Regions:
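Helix-loop element at the rim of GNAT/NAT acetyltransferase active sites that forms part
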Residues: 11, 15-28, 65
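Active-site rim helix/loop that mediates acceptor-substrate recognition in acyltransferases
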Residues: 25-48, 58
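Conserved beta-strand in the GNAT
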Residues: 46, 52-61, 76, 81
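Conserved acetyl-CoA binding element of GNAT-fold acetyltransferases
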Residues: 70-84, 139
Length: 144
């Protein structure tokens, strides 16, 4: 398995993988990944089994407050996806390590992430990866 930093030419591939995570049309996601792959404030990584992409991670700098942290900016894991056939084989862990290494390389001393309250698999992964749960939040909205 190979993990490498993505470049703008990888944007269609990133968009395909991300569409499985966020249930969005890859065509809508692709321009965003073009921007992310050239931004000094973000990084995307791809995992390959041979020549087949099997996962991705997106991380970026957050300058606003991140729960449980005391510095700024903070590296933040924005998205992580591994194809089902390759899950529980260390792929996600290696992708997160690549993001953490990137965050360190741009001067971060803290790294954050989040997950949905009902995503037990993500919670278990985060805890096993060394993250500590620091808060639980339910957001509300109403039309005016």
């Amino acid at each position: 398995m190979l993990i490498r930093k993505a470049s703008p030419v990888d944007s269609p591939l990133l968009a395909q993988l991300a569409s499985r995570l966020w249930a969005q049309d890859p065509a809508e996601l692709e321009p965003e990944f073009v921007n992310l792959t050239v931004s000094p404030e973000a990084a995307c990584f791809l995992a390959f089994d041979g020549v087949v992409a099997i996962g991705f991670a997106q991380c970026q700098l957050r300058h606003d407050y991140v729960e449980g942290t005391s510095t700024s900016p903070v590296g933040f894991l924005e998205g992580l996806w591994v194809e089902e056939a390759h899950q529980r084989q260390g792929v996600a862990t290696q992708l997160v390590h690549a993001c953490e290494d990137w965050a360190r390389s741009v001067g971060c001393t803290e790294f954050g992430s989040d997950c949905e309250l009902d995503n037990g698999a993500s919670l278990a992964f985060h805890l096993a990866s060394g993250f500590e749960e620091v808060n639980r939040t339910i957001w509300f909205a109403k039309k005016l």
